[in-house]
Amino acid sequence: MKKKITILLVFIFTIFLIGKSFSAQITIDAYGMDKYFNYDVDKGRQFLTYSSEGLFVTNIGINGVVECKGIVEIITGITSSNIMCKYAEDNGDIFFAQFFIKRGTVSEDATVQSFEFVSGEGRWAEIVGQKCIGAYTPMAQERFMWKGKCEMSNKTLERVKNYKKPD
């Protein structure tokens, strides 16, 4: 009986530690202007090219500019996309993130995307391969707002946050 209780306590403690080690989160907010060029291919089918420029801010004090380009396709109400964004922080380091629409369409109020850090310099090299989630909201006059979040370990977030660019 003592052995079972010990195993159970070790199991609970391990789950607690794992939960604590992956409890950190980085958030990215972006705001800017976007443009769509639309082909009405056929009834129920649209092909759009997408581009945007804007600013981004994070919850860890990193800011910069973002530029995105890609395609969006809508076939009988189902939206797919492939959008690549280049983020450049104030110190010159860049990262690329690739976005895929998971829910919603560009004609609705918002879309939810999955995105992944596919390339990065400096602090961003630490999270290449990280998969995250974001939400895009179109605004009036070709404006947009976007918010993304990425779950990661506390240690990884601390390394990203405290990164010092070599001289």
Language-model region placement:
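Positively charged n-region of N-terminal signal peptides that target proteins for export
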Residues: 1-4
